[in-house]
Amino acid sequence: VGFCPYRIYWKNKNNMNSNKLKDLVLQNYETEWKNYDAIIGEPISIGGTKIIKVIKYGKLAILRNPKAIFSRSGQTIRWQFDMFHGSGNLDKAIELLPNKDRDDFKHFTRNETSFSRGNMFISKSPKIINLYFRDVFDWLKSCEGIFGFNLEGYGKIRMYAFLAERYL
Protein backbone atom coordinates (compact mmCIF):
# COMPACT_ATOMS: atom_id res chain seq x y z
CA VAL A 1 0.00 0.00 0.00
CA GLY A 2 1.27 3.48 -0.79
CA PHE A 3 0.11 7.04 -0.30
CA CYS A 4 1.31 9.88 -2.50
CA PRO A 5 -0.35 12.94 -4.03
CA TYR A 6 2.33 13.21 -6.73
CA ARG A 7 1.32 10.45 -9.12
CA ILE A 8 4.42 10.93 -11.26
CA TYR A 9 6.54 9.22 -8.60
CA TRP A 10 4.67 5.94 -8.85
CA LYS A 11 4.38 5.74 -12.62
CA ASN A 12 6.29 3.23 -14.67
CA LYS A 13 8.52 5.60 -16.66
CA ASN A 14 8.93 3.13 -19.52
CA ASN A 15 5.23 3.20 -20.43
CA MET A 16 4.26 6.82 -19.86
CA ASN A 17 2.17 6.99 -23.05
CA SER A 18 -0.03 4.02 -22.22
CA ASN A 19 -3.67 4.36 -21.23
CA LYS A 20 -3.79 1.01 -19.42
CA LEU A 21 -3.56 1.40 -15.65
CA LYS A 22 -1.43 -1.70 -15.19
CA ASP A 23 1.13 -0.23 -17.61
CA LEU A 24 1.30 3.05 -15.69
CA VAL A 25 1.94 1.84 -12.15
CA LEU A 26 4.86 -0.06 -10.70
CA GLN A 27 4.40 -3.81 -10.99
CA ASN A 28 7.73 -4.89 -9.50
CA TYR A 29 9.86 -3.63 -6.66
CA GLU A 30 13.49 -3.67 -5.64
CA THR A 31 14.49 -7.02 -4.11
CA GLU A 32 16.10 -5.34 -1.10
CA TRP A 33 12.72 -3.82 -0.18
CA LYS A 34 11.71 -7.24 1.18
CA ASN A 35 13.95 -6.55 4.18
CA TYR A 36 12.00 -3.47 5.28
CA ASP A 37 8.56 -2.84 6.76
CA ALA A 38 8.23 0.50 4.97
CA ILE A 39 9.92 2.34 2.10
CA ILE A 40 9.96 6.13 1.78
CA GLY A 41 11.16 8.21 -1.13
CA GLU A 42 14.66 9.55 -1.58
CA PRO A 43 15.12 12.81 0.30
CA ILE A 44 15.47 16.07 -1.58
CA SER A 45 17.67 18.91 -0.45
CA ILE A 46 16.07 22.29 0.17
CA GLY A 47 19.36 24.16 0.21
CA GLY A 48 20.44 26.46 -2.57
CA THR A 49 17.24 28.48 -2.86
CA LYS A 50 17.74 31.25 -5.40
CA ILE A 51 18.33 34.65 -3.82
CA ILE A 52 15.45 36.19 -5.81
CA LYS A 53 13.02 33.73 -4.13
CA VAL A 54 14.48 34.55 -0.73
CA ILE A 55 13.96 38.27 -1.40
CA LYS A 56 10.43 37.70 -2.71
CA TYR A 57 9.15 35.20 -0.13
CA GLY A 58 11.65 34.93 2.68
CA LYS A 59 12.02 38.27 4.44
CA LEU A 60 10.48 37.04 7.70
CA ALA A 61 12.24 33.68 7.40
CA ILE A 62 15.59 35.50 7.14
CA LEU A 63 14.79 37.57 10.22
CA ARG A 64 14.12 34.36 12.14
CA ASN A 65 17.21 32.62 10.77
CA PRO A 66 19.78 35.04 9.30
CA LYS A 67 22.47 32.37 8.92
CA ALA A 68 20.43 30.93 6.03
CA ILE A 69 21.80 33.74 3.85
CA PHE A 70 25.40 32.71 4.42
CA SER A 71 25.22 28.95 4.80
CA ARG A 72 23.26 26.11 3.26
CA SER A 73 23.24 24.47 6.68
CA GLY A 74 21.04 27.36 7.82
CA GLN A 75 18.54 26.58 5.09
CA THR A 76 16.66 24.08 7.21
CA ILE A 77 13.22 22.57 6.76
CA ARG A 78 11.88 25.14 9.21
CA TRP A 79 13.47 28.03 7.30
CA GLN A 80 12.08 26.78 3.98
CA PHE A 81 8.61 26.24 5.48
CA ASP A 82 8.62 29.73 7.01
CA MET A 83 9.59 31.21 3.67
CA PHE A 84 6.98 29.51 1.48
CA HIS A 85 4.15 28.52 3.83
CA GLY A 86 3.97 31.33 6.39
CA SER A 87 6.49 32.41 8.98
CA GLY A 88 5.87 30.64 12.28
CA ASN A 89 3.18 28.30 10.93
CA LEU A 90 5.35 25.21 11.26
CA ASP A 91 6.17 26.07 14.88
CA LYS A 92 2.46 26.53 15.66
CA ALA A 93 1.70 23.15 14.09
CA ILE A 94 4.54 21.41 15.95
CA GLU A 95 3.10 22.59 19.27
CA LEU A 96 -0.03 20.56 18.45
CA LEU A 97 1.86 17.29 18.02
CA PRO A 98 1.59 14.67 20.76
CA ASN A 99 4.41 14.82 23.32
CA LYS A 100 5.90 11.59 21.93
CA ASP A 101 6.64 13.27 18.58
CA ARG A 102 7.02 16.97 19.35
CA ASP A 103 10.67 17.26 20.39
CA ASP A 104 12.02 14.92 17.71
CA PHE A 105 10.05 16.65 14.96
CA LYS A 106 11.09 20.09 16.20
CA HIS A 107 14.73 18.98 16.18
CA PHE A 108 14.32 17.46 12.70
CA THR A 109 12.81 20.62 11.19
CA ARG A 110 15.38 22.93 12.77
CA ASN A 111 18.44 20.87 11.86
CA GLU A 112 17.79 18.93 8.67
CA THR A 113 18.14 20.36 5.17
CA SER A 114 16.36 17.57 3.29
CA PHE A 115 13.16 15.56 3.56
CA SER A 116 11.31 12.86 1.64
CA ARG A 117 9.17 14.84 -0.76
CA GLY A 118 5.74 13.69 -1.80
CA ASN A 119 4.37 12.29 1.45
CA MET A 120 4.86 8.91 -0.14
CA PHE A 121 5.61 5.53 1.26
CA ILE A 122 5.00 1.88 0.61
CA SER A 123 4.44 -0.51 3.48
CA LYS A 124 3.53 -4.13 3.86
CA SER A 125 2.53 -3.57 7.48
CA PRO A 126 -1.10 -2.60 8.16
CA LYS A 127 -0.01 -1.62 11.69
CA ILE A 128 2.53 0.92 10.40
CA ILE A 129 0.07 2.32 7.87
CA ASN A 130 -2.73 2.65 10.43
CA LEU A 131 -0.48 4.27 13.04
CA TYR A 132 0.87 6.76 10.53
CA PHE A 133 -2.55 7.75 9.20
CA ARG A 134 -4.00 7.99 12.70
CA ASP A 135 -1.17 10.20 13.93
CA VAL A 136 -0.91 12.45 10.88
CA PHE A 137 -4.65 12.99 10.46
CA ASP A 138 -5.21 13.60 14.18
CA TRP A 139 -2.44 16.21 14.02
CA LEU A 140 -3.78 17.84 10.86
CA LYS A 141 -7.27 17.99 12.37
CA SER A 142 -5.80 19.84 15.36
CA CYS A 143 -4.05 22.21 12.95
CA GLU A 144 -7.40 23.05 11.33
CA GLY A 145 -8.36 24.79 14.57
CA ILE A 146 -5.46 27.22 14.14
CA PHE A 147 -5.16 27.63 10.37
CA GLY A 148 -8.70 26.90 9.17
CA PHE A 149 -9.43 26.63 5.46
CA ASN A 150 -9.60 30.24 4.29
CA LEU A 151 -5.97 30.24 3.25
CA GLU A 152 -4.65 32.22 0.29
CA GLY A 153 -1.77 31.50 -2.04
CA TYR A 154 -0.41 28.15 -3.22
CA GLY A 155 1.95 27.71 -0.26
CA LYS A 156 -0.80 28.24 2.29
CA ILE A 157 -3.73 26.58 0.49
CA ARG A 158 -1.75 23.32 0.41
CA MET A 159 -0.22 23.80 3.87
CA TYR A 160 -1.79 20.63 5.27
CA ALA A 161 -0.20 18.53 2.52
CA PHE A 162 3.14 20.22 3.13
CA LEU A 163 2.90 19.61 6.90
CA ALA A 164 2.17 15.92 6.33
CA GLU A 165 5.02 15.73 3.83
CA ARG A 166 7.52 16.99 6.41
CA TYR A 167 6.06 14.75 9.13
CA LEU A 168 6.72 11.57 7.16
Predicted regions and their residues:
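ER/Golgi luminal nucleotide-sugar-dependent glycosyltransferases, focusing on the catalytic module
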Residues: 1-168
